[in-house]
Amino acid sequence: MPYPMQLGFQDATSPIMEELTYFHDHTLMIVFLISSLVLYIIILMLTTKLTHTSTMDAQEVETIWTILPAVILVLIALPSLRILYMMDEIYNPYLTIKAMGHQWYWSYEYTDYEDLTFDSYMIPTQELTPGQLRLLEVDNRVVLPMELPIRVLISSEDVIHAWTVPSLGLKADAIPGRLNQATLTSTRPGVYYGQCSEICGSNHSFMPIVLEMTTLKYFEKWSSMMQ
């Protein structure tokens, strides 16, 4: 859930987002150590009175500062590639939905059902009720079962959009004529917000995404009512 003046990530709601958070901390630790070392060397050079004017080369030092960055890059690349393959892996999804971007709203189709489609528009500020979030609420939420793998097919009817839900670690481009796919699995029930993350025109900021993750029993009841 996002909140005002937030600096960190939203609480992770999917295994992928948890892995991304761990990877962020891992990379940030490496960056902090490198920055601290560089700052220490700069301060040492500015404050010391010792000079080494006779040194022409230093093979040992050059070897170290060649091998060490390569090792650091490997330590960053390996977990990154692991998460990349995890995000791309889709095995036996319980449900498939199609998200189509428009200027400026989203339309959804539950492909496993005969007639379950709807458009999702942002609720204008003047129509919000107490407790609803400005610029994030929609008239039709995407209801999905939690703890089950869901495949999302993403495309666009006009210009390039991006379907993004930060707490689930999801961001996929919606490109006209191209079908991208993503997978999501929520570990707990709740309402999760996202927005179009690709500048798509004058109302780009007004096409939010709202996912309502619920129990399988409630989802089946909701889907039968919507058809």
UniProtKB/Swiss-Prot annotation:
A cellular component annotation (GO) from this entry: mitochondrial inner membrane
Record: residues binding Cu cation A1: 161, 196, 200, 207
A single MF term (Gene Ontology): copper ion binding
Assembly, per entry: Component of the cytochrome c oxidase (complex IV, CIV), a multisubunit enzyme composed of 14 subunits. The complex is composed of a catalytic core of 3 subunits MT-CO1, MT-CO2 and MT-CO3, encoded in the mitochondrial DNA, and 11 supernumerary subunits COX4I, COX5A, COX5B, COX6A, COX6B, COX6C, COX7A, COX7B, COX7C, COX8 and NDUFA4, which are encoded in the nuclear genome.
Signal peptide segment: none
NCBIfam families named among the record's database cross-references: CoxB
Mitochondrial matrix side: 46-59
Gene designation per UniProt: MT-CO2
EC number(s) on file: 7.1.1.9
Cofactor needs: Cu cation
Xref: InterPro entries: CcO_II, CcO_II-like_C, CcO_II_C, Copper_CuA, Cupredoxin, Cyt_c_oxidase_su2, Cyt_c_oxidase_su2_TM_dom, Cyt_c_oxidase_su2_TM_sf
Transmembrane domains' residue ranges: 15-45, 60-87
UniProt protein name: Cytochrome c oxidase subunit 2
Ranges of the Mitochondrial intermembrane topological domain: 1-14, 88-227
Binding site for Mg(2+): 198
Known catalytic reactions: 4 Fe(II)-[cytochrome c] + O2 + 8 H(+)(in) = 4 Fe(III)-[cytochrome c] + 2 H2O + 4 H(+)(out)
